[in-house]
Amino acid sequence: MGVKRFGDWDKAKALLANNPGARLTLAIRQATIKNALLLVREIKRGIVKQAPGGVPFVKLAESTIERKGSSKALIDTGFLLSAITQKIMADQAFVGLLRGTVNKDGEQMVNIGAIMEYGATIKHPSGVTIILPARPFLHPVMEAYREQVIENYRQAIRSVF
């Protein structure tokens, strides 16, 4: 049984002769940076607008609004907003809160972010239970921009070939 070739082999040889590996690597890296910056910008914008990815936050309790003097969630000190970042590693990117980032009280921002993203129930020894509802600020943005991120990678690949 022989092997049959199909497709435009002359075109394939021409494309591969130009060593697309280095150009493809660069294009993918540039798309990765573009996507990471897009997501960081939109996560921050979503927090400020109180609707990351178009999904409105659960409203604050009246007692919280009175104590804070504001009805806006996640922006009273600005530490969470300023801690949202990206880290590029070759053709990968991390977008969110880096471990080791702390606020002025020494609290890990990644822990605070997890509580905000997923919610929490805190039981005090006095018997009082505080329920913090989830106010997702990362996942809704990543879902909303999923197709744009994919398209950015497609364009990067097309630019090489």
Question: What positions do the PLM features span?
Answer:
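Short, Lys/Arg-rich flexible segments
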Residues: 1-161
